[in-house]
């Protein structure tokens, strides 16, 4: 059994701040735990814009605080995401988040991330693996 709190993660290598300066993420469960998924709490900052494309991962996101516009960049369709709303990127959709307020969410990734990932120039997380 693993028990971990946010205070255990803050200011460690599990507390990732993006190079773009638009988000930060607490990586609660990672690939090295070998459970088949990773679990994160992420905050996207108010007034920013982050374009993403999880070409190598499936992501489920549950908003717990704040408001943001989610745009499917492939179709132009937009959704207003508020607390209690979930979205699932089951088709590796290119998408953009535009938080009106600080936007806090819980994210699940499959395959799991290692904790070192940040978006590249295409908004993609590289597919990294943990050494056995």
Curated annotation (Swiss-Prot):
One Pfam family named in its UniProt record? Ectoine_synth
Q: Which family does it belong to?
A: Belongs to the ectoine synthase family.
State the protein's purpose: Catalyzes the circularization of gamma-N-acetyl-alpha,gamma-diaminobutyric acid (ADABA) to ectoine (1,4,5,6-tetrahydro-2-methyl-4-pyrimidine carboxylic acid), which is an excellent osmoprotectant.
The record's GO molecular-function terms, alphabetically, read: ectoine synthase activity
This entry's Enzyme Commission designation comes to 4.2.1.108
Origin species: Streptomyces griseus subsp. griseus (strain JCM 4626 / CBS 651.72 / NBRC 13350 / KCC S-0626 / ISP 5235)
Q: What Gene3D superfamilies does the record point to?
A: Jelly Rolls
Its top-level enzyme class, in one word, is lyase
Q: Which gene encodes it?
A: ectC
GO BP field = ectoine biosynthetic process
Q: What reaction does this enzyme carry out catalytically?
A: (2S)-4-acetamido-2-aminobutanoate = L-ectoine + H2O
The molecule here is called L-ectoine synthase
Pathway assignment reads:
Amine and polyamine biosynthesis; ectoine biosynthesis; L-ectoine from L-aspartate 4-semialdehyde: step 3/3
Q: What keyword terms does UniProt attach to this protein?
A: Lyase
> Which InterPro entries does the UniProt record give?
Ectoine_synth (IPR010462), RmlC-like_jellyroll (IPR014710), RmlC_Cupin_sf (IPR011051)
């Amino acid at each position: 059994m693993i028990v971990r709190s946010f205070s255990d993660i803050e200011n460690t290598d599990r507390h990732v701040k993006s190079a773009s300066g638009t988000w930060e993420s607490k990586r609660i469960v990672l690939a090295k735990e070998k459970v088949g998924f990773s679990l994160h709490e992420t905050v996207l900052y108010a007034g920013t814009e982050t374009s993403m494309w999880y070409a190598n991962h499936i992501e489920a996101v549950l908003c717990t605080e704040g408001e943001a516009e989610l745009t499917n960049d492939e179709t132009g369709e937009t959704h207003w995401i508020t607390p209690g709303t979930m979205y699932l990127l089951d088709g590796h959709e290119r998408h953009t988040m535009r938080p009106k307020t600080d936007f806090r969410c819980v994210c699940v990734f499959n395959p799991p991330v290692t904790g070192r990932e940040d978006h590249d120039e295409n908004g993609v997380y590289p597919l990294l693996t943990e050494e056995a």
